[in-house]
Amino acid sequence: ILNVENKPIEVRASFDQGSTPAQFAYHPVQQSSAPTAVLEVNLNDMSKLPLYEAEAKSFIYGIPGMHQLTSTQTIGEDDSVFSVDNLPAFTIGWGLYTAKLARDYDLYRSPYGKLGSLMLESRYAARLIVDIKLNQNLLSDEQALVFLKEQGFETAESAHLAISTSRQSPGKQTSAISGLLAFMSLRSRFETKLGDRFN
């Protein structure tokens, strides 16, 4: 169990054998049956979970990524929860930004971790292109599949899942990269403004 400001996240192994099982699934505390947030790591097929991606994904989903972000959600007086879970620009965008931040500040334990971070960034960039072109009917599912495998380092299974996501939630993949770019732009602006005082 990882902990951030008394808001722990439990990392669980799962062995999901569904048709398109996610390798990593993050469940904030509000969506989890457990008293903590849960990060499920699917160990059913280890060939789909390369070690060079694992460290980058732990930054994206754990601390300082999406768990850190969703742990700061506020609960109102009527117990209603302000949730950012369905704002991919904010959640996934922040997660991708933290993976990049870890790369910029040399927090990866090996060059393979950095490689995994770059590959995931490329994957989301490829998904952005597919998301836009699929939903403008400029690309067939078959063409999208080939593109994601060649340009996004996707397995056939993860590419099918990305295509399905783009069909069911148009703009979700685009939103994630838009969020990453927005966080990078904000950082650049404050680096310029603060100079040596930027930390």
Language model features with spans:
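Long, His/Glu/Asp-enriched segments that create or flank divalent metal/ion-associated functional microenvironments
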Residues: 1-199
